[in-house]
C-alpha cells in the first residue's frame, strides 16, 4: 500500500489548500492509459507499480492512474510533483522550505490524529490501531528523493517511496540529502510528530522514518533510449518525425527550488493557479541517445564482406549476393541518412582494402570482418577508435619517419571524394591512421554530428528553455534533406 498516496487521499479533506494541492489521479476515477511492463516508482503518487510514459517528457515515470493529469516534474505549474522537484545545487534553506511544506500539507497534531482515529473507528471492527487503517498517519518527513541527470542538470524529486529494494527500470536513482540538512534536526521534527500518535503506531512510524532517512545514496544512472516511450522509438527511422509533448504552465517564479514556499501563502498560490494553461511543443528527435540507437541497429545488420567485393553498386543496393546483401526489410533503412552513412563508410573501407590487401572476392573469409562490426557506432568513441585502429593495422601499413602509411589508390564514389576534399583538403594517395579516422568521422558527422548533440532529446528541457528555443524555431529539426554539415 502506497503511504504517500494514502496520505494525500486523507489529508486532502482537511482544508481548501490541501484539496487543490493533494489531488492525485491515482485517488480519482481511473481513466485508461497505455499499459506497459516498466517497473518503477510513479513520481506523482510515489507507489511502485507498472509505469507508462509521461506526456511531458516521454520518459516512463507515471502510473496509468496518474497519467490522466499529465503532470511532469519539468512542468511550470505549482502542482505537488513540481513543488517536490528541486534542481542542481540544493541548499539547507531549500530543504527547510521542503520540510515546512510537508508540515503544512501533512500536519500532525492531537486534533488531526484524533479526528482520523475517530473517523476510522466509526467503521465496523476497527477499534484497534492496525497499521493498514492508519497508513496515512505513518508517513514520516524524510529527505528521500529520486534523482536524474539530464544534460548537465540534476533533478531531485522528493517524496516518500515505499519498498526501495523493488525492481527499478527507470533512469531515476535514490539519493538521500539528509546530510545537507541536519539529521538531528530532522529527527526532532519527526519525533515531535510521532509523539501525537498512539503508542502502538509509534514503533511503525519510527521504523519507517529511520529506514528512509539513513539509507546510502545509489550511484546515478545513465539515461538510455529504453527509458523513452516505445511510440517514439518506433518512429525514429522517419527523419521528419517530431515528438509531440504537452506541459502544464503558469506564471510561476523563475526560482526553481522556491516553488515549495507557495503553500505558505494560500492566496498567492491560488492566484498562480488561475494562470494555469497547457502548452504544446513539437520536438525534434535529434540527440545522441536516439542517434546511437539507430547506429547500433544498423551495426547489427552489417555485411562486412562488401569491403572485399567487386560489386559496382553501393552497399545497400546489392541484391542476390549471399555475403553482401543486407536485409532491407528493417525500418532503420527507411532513414536515408543511415543508408548514406553505410554506403559511404563501406565504399571508403573497400577502397582501403583493395589498395593494400590482395583479396579477390566477397566470399573469402578475412580477419578484418571482425573489426568492422562497431564501425558505425561513433557515439562509443573508445570502442569505435579501437575498431579503426585494428582495420588500419590489418592493412599492413608501412612505417616512414616514425609514421605509418597505407595506400589509397582505388576508386571511390563522389560522396566520399567530397568528404576527402572537405576533411583533408585533397584526394590523397597515401593515408595515416589519423587521416583514416578523420575521414570516417566526417562521413558519419555529415549526417549525425554527435560532437555537438545533446545527450537526451529536448523533451527533457524545462519550459523556460523550450520557450526560448520556440522563439528561434529551434525545437524542430532541419529539413529532412539537409545534413548537419549543411
Swiss-Prot record:
GO terms for cellular component: host cell cytoplasm; host cytoskeleton. Plays a role in the inhibition of host innate immunity by inducing the degradation of key host factors required to activate interferon production such as IRF3, IRF5 or IRF7. Associates with components of cullin RING ligases (CRLs) including CUL1 or CUL3, which are essential multisubunit ubiquitination complexes, to modulate their activities. Recognizes the host NF-kappa-B regulator BTRC through the presence of a DSGXS motif in the C-terminal substrate recognition domain. Residues 1-81 are annotated as: RNA-binding. The C-terminal region is phosphorylated by host CKII/CSNK2A1. Phosphorylation of the DSGXS motif is essential for host NF-kappa-B inhibition. Belongs to the rotavirus NSP1 family. GO terms for molecular function: metal ion binding; RNA binding. The lineage of its organism: Viruses, Riboviria, Orthornavirae, Duplornaviricota, Resentoviricetes. The keyword Signal does not apply. It holds the Pfam family Rota_NS53. Residues 42-79 are annotated as: Zinc-binding domain. One of its GO terms (biological process) is symbiont-mediated suppression of host cytoplasmic pattern recognition receptor signaling pathway via inhibition of IRF3 activity. This is Non-structural protein 1. The keyword Membrane does not apply. Its main location: host cell. It comes from Rotavirus A (strain RVA/Pig/United States/OSU/1977/G5P9[7]).
Amino acid at each position: 500500500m502506497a503511504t504517500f498516496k494514502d496520505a494525500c487521499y486523507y489529508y486532502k479533506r482537511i482544508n481548501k489548500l490541501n484539496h487543490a494541492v493533494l489531488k492525485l489521479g491515482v485517488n480519482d476515477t481511473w481513466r485508461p492509459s497505455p499499459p506497459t511492463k516498466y517497473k518503477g516508482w510513479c513520481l506523482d503518487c510515489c507507489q511502485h507499480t507498472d509505469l507508462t510514459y509521461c506526456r511531458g517528457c516521454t520518459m516512463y515515470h507515471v502510473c496509468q492512474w496518474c497519467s490522466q493529469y499529465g503532470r511532469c516534474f519539468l512542468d511550470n505549474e505549482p502542482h505537488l510533483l513540481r513543488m517536490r522537484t528541486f534542481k542542481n545545487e540544493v541548499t539547507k534553506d531549500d530543504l527547510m522550505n521542503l520540510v515546512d511544506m510537508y508540515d503544512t500539507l501533512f500536519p500532525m497534531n492531537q486534533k488531526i490524529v484524533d479526528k482520523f482515529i475517530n473517523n476510522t473507528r466509526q467503521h465496523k471492527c476497527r477499534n484497534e490501531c492496525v497499521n493498514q487503517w492508519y497508513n496515512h498517519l505513518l508517513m514520516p518527513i524524510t529527505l528521500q528523493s529520486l534523482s536524474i541527470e539530464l544534460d548537465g542538470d540534476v533533478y531531485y524529486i522528493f517524496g516518500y517511496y515505499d519498498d526501495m529494494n523493488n525492481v527499478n527500470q527507470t533512469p531515476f536513482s535514490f539519493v538521500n540529502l539528509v546530510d545537507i540538512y541536519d539529521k538531528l534536526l530532522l529527527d526532532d521534527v519527526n519525533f515531535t510528530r510521532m509523539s501525537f500518535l498512539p503508542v502502538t503506531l509509534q514503533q511503525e512510524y519510527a521504523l519507517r522514518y529511520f529506514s528512509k532517512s539513513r539509507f546510502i545514496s545509489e550511484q546515478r544512472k545513465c539515461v538510455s533510449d529504453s527509458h523513452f516511450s516505445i511510440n517514439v522509438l518506433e518512429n525514429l527511422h522517419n527523419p521528419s518525425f517530431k515528438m509531440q509533448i504537452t506541459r502544464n504552465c503558469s506564471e510561476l517564479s523563475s526560482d526553481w527550488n522556491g516553488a515549495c514556499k507557495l503553500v505558505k501563502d494560500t492566496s498567492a498560490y491560488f492566484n498562480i493557479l488561475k494562470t494555469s494553461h497547457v502548452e504544446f511543443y513539437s520536438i525534434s528527435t535529434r540527440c545522441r541517445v536516439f542517434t546511437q540507437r539507430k547506429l547500433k541497429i544498423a551495426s547489427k545488420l552489417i555485411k562486412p564482406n562488401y569491403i572485399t567485393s567487386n560489386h559496382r553498386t553501393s552497399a545497400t543496393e546489392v541484391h542476390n549476393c549471399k555475403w553482401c546483401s543486407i536485409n532491407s526489410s528493417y525500418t532503420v533503412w527507411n532513414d536515408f541518412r543511415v543508408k548514406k552513412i553505410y554506403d559511404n563508410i563501406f565504399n571508403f573501407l573497400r577502397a582501403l582494402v583493395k589498395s593494400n590487401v590482395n583479396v579477390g572476392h566477397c566470399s573469402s573469409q578475412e580477419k578484418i570482418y571482425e573489426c568492422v562490426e562497431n564501425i558505425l557506432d561513433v557515439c562509443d568513441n573508445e570502442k569505435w577508435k579501437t575498431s579503426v585502429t585494428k582495420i588500419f593495422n590489418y592493412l599492413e601499413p608501412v612505417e616512414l619517419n616514425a609514421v605509418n602509411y597505407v595506400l589509397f589508390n582505388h576508386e571511390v564514389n563522389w560522396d566520399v571524394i567530397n568528404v576527402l576534399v572537405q576533411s583533408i583538403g585533397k584526394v590523397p594517395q597515401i593515408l595515416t591512421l589519423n587521416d583514416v579516422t578523420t575521414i570516417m568521422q566526417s562521413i558519419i558527422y555529415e549526417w549525425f554530428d554527435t560532437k555537438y548533440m545533446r545527450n537526451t532529446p529536448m523533451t527533457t528541457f524545462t519550459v523556460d528553455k523550450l520557450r526560448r528555443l520556440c522563439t528561434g524555431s529551434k525545437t524542430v529539426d532541419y529539413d529532412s534533406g539537409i545534413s548537419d554539415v549543411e
